[in-house]
């Protein structure tokens, strides 16, 4: 066998640059995130909104967000644990609860932007 040089010496560790924290934790794929949040350059500083849905064991979280340099800004949010206030008592993590939570988010977003009168939704049952 020939001579094997030690690669991880003091100079190696002195110049080593760690990855971003969320990359080290395995939470963020920055390549996919870049493709998701970058707006077209001909749209001139217009935010690119996206809907984020997280399903936990006991809740469903829906959010509308857009990316800024300082971090993502949440415009509006709705949670499945708020649904009992509107009459949905059980099953807060199933398909129907996800639909209701998204509907609640949409109504809140329309109210926030003042478009609730334009898009009234279903009024007759």
UniProtKB/Swiss-Prot annotation:
Disulfide cross-links: none
SUPFAM superfamilies on file: Translational machinery components (SSF53137)
One GO term (biological process): translation
Record GO terms (molecular function): 5S rRNA binding; structural constituent of ribosome
Top-level taxon of the source organism: Eukaryota
Keywords from the named record: Acetylation, Cytoplasm, Nucleus, Ribonucleoprotein, Ribosomal protein, RNA-binding, rRNA-binding
Protein location: Cytoplasm; Nucleus, Nucleolus
Family matches, as InterPro entries: Rbsml_uL18_euk (IPR005485)
Sections of the chain in a coiled coil: none
Entry annotated with the keyword Nucleus: yes
CDD domains xrefs: Ribosomal_L18_L5e (cd00432)
Pfam families, per database record: Ribosomal_L5e
N6-acetyllysine PTM positions: 5, 48
Function according to Swiss-Prot or TrEMBL: Component of the ribosome, a large ribonucleoprotein complex responsible for the synthesis of proteins in the cell. The small ribosomal subunit (SSU) binds messenger RNAs (mRNAs) and translates the encoded message by selecting cognate aminoacyl-transfer RNA (tRNA) molecules. The large subunit (LSU) contains the ribosomal catalytic site termed the peptidyl transferase center (PTC), which catalyzes the formation of peptide bonds, thereby polymerizing the amino acids delivered by tRNAs into a polypeptide chain.
Family: Belongs to the universal ribosomal protein uL18 family.
Oligomeric and partner information: Component of the large ribosomal subunit (LSU). Part of the 5S RNP complex, which is a LSU subcomplex composed of the 5S RNA, RPL5 and RPL11. Component of a hexameric 5S RNP precursor complex, composed of 5S RNA, RRS1, RPF2/BXDC1, RPL5, RPL11 and HEATR3; this complex acts as a precursor for ribosome assembly. Interacts with NVL in an ATP-dependent manner. Interacts with RRP1B. Interacts with IPO5, IPO7 and KPNB1; these interactions may be involved in RPL5 nuclear import for the assembly of ribosomal subunits. Interacts with RRP1B.
The protein, known as: Large ribosomal subunit protein uL18
The species this protein was found in: Sus scrofa
Gene: RPL5
């Amino acid at each position: 066998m020939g001579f094997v040089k030690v690669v991880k010496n003091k100079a190696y560790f002195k110049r080593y640059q760690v990855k971003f924290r969320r990359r080290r934790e395995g939470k963020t794929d920055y390549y996919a995130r870049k493709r998701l949040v970058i707006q077209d350059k001909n749209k001139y500083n217009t935010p690119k909104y996206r809907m984020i849905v997280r399903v936990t064991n006991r809740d469903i979280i829906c959010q509308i967000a857009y990316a800024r340099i300082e971090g993502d800004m949440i415009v509006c949010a709705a949670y499945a644990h708020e649904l009992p206030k509107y009459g949905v008592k059980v099953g807060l993590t199933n398909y129907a609860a996800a639909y209701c939570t998204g509907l609640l988010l949409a109504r809140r977003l329309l109210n926030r932007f003042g478009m609730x009168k334009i898009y009234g939704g279903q009024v007759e049952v």
